[in-house]
Amino acid sequence: MKRDYDLARKYYRLGVLESDAYCYCQLGVMYALGQGVKKDAHAALDYYMQAAEMGDALCYCNVAWLYESGELGKPDLRTAIKWYKKGAIRKEEHAIEALKRLNVPFEK
């Protein structure tokens, strides 16, 4: 199946105009992965942060991953763990698994 990233981006941007956290997150994914746009971790972070501020727990994980992986420059585990913990508090399974993988204690 052919993916139409231009069309997806168009509709996600319309969602952003309505302050839709999911659309912010998906635009972040597009920039993080370079899907139909030039790969740009800093633009991805901006979109993820907007969604995170709206309470999107998955975007807490996406922010954390950008810091953990070094996509933004030098890897920053301290900041990544802070964001994974925010996601784990909201019961986001990806965040909980990441904390386990990093051997960071966390109680639900």
Predicted features along the sequence, with ranges:
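Hydrophobic face of amphipathic alpha-helices that form TPR/SEL1-like repeat modules
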Residues: M1, Q26-L33, N62-S69, R101-P105
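Short helix-capping/linker turns of helical repeat alpha-solenoids
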Residues: L17-D20, L33-Q35, D40, E53-D56, ...
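Terminal, low-structured helical/coil segments at or just beyond the last alpha-helical repeat
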Residues: K86-K108
